[in-house]
Amino acid sequence: MADENLQPVFQIQRVYLKDLSLEQPNSPAIFLEQDAPVIEVAVDVGAEQLAEGLFESTVTITVTAKINDKVAFLVEAKQAGIFEARNIPDEQLDPLIGIGCPSTIYPYLRANIADAITRAGFPPVHLSEINFEVFYQQRLEALAQQHASNGSGIVMPDGSAAQH
């Protein structure tokens, strides 16, 4: 029976849209513009330990569309998920929380952003796939630079180690 309790567990508890904002500061005049918008996309990833074995993972994306230096729209959305991860070694837990969880919730975020932009009266912006391993590696490098030796080994959005 004790062996069963030590089996690795990883499952999604919930996926939810944590924040969504849309701004159209130059409407309705912007709809009369004939030029194609220039799209800028910014991405951020976060993680927080909620309780023993429970983690919240977030992906935030800001999409800004400009036509002739005027903002057509700005959408910022944060998709989150609560994940249960128990009996997983730190060397496997870190990549799971830093890479696997964001990869799981990102498709929901892409759909929500495309829907918000379409409902605002613009053609949808189809966000490309993201390699979340790059974000994870950047955070590991930041953590190594800070020489943080105490913590759970989970790298937080600011590059610090999560504390137990």
From Swiss-Prot:
SUPFAM superfamilies: SecB-like. Belongs to the SecB family. Coiled coil: none annotated. One of its GO terms (cellular component) is cytoplasm. InterPro entries: SecB, SecB-like_sf. This is Protein-export protein SecB. Keywords: Chaperone, Cytoplasm, Protein transport, Translocation, Transport. One of its GO terms (molecular function) is unfolded protein binding. Homotetramer, a dimer of dimers. One homotetramer interacts with 1 SecA dimer. The keyword Electron transport does not apply. The keyword Flavoprotein does not apply. GO terms for biological process: protein folding; protein tetramerization; protein transport. One of the proteins required for the normal export of preproteins out of the cell cytoplasm. It is a molecular chaperone that binds to a subset of precursor proteins, maintaining them in a translocation-competent state. It also specifically binds to its receptor SecA. It holds the Pfam family SecB. It comes from the Bacteria. It is found in: Cytoplasm.
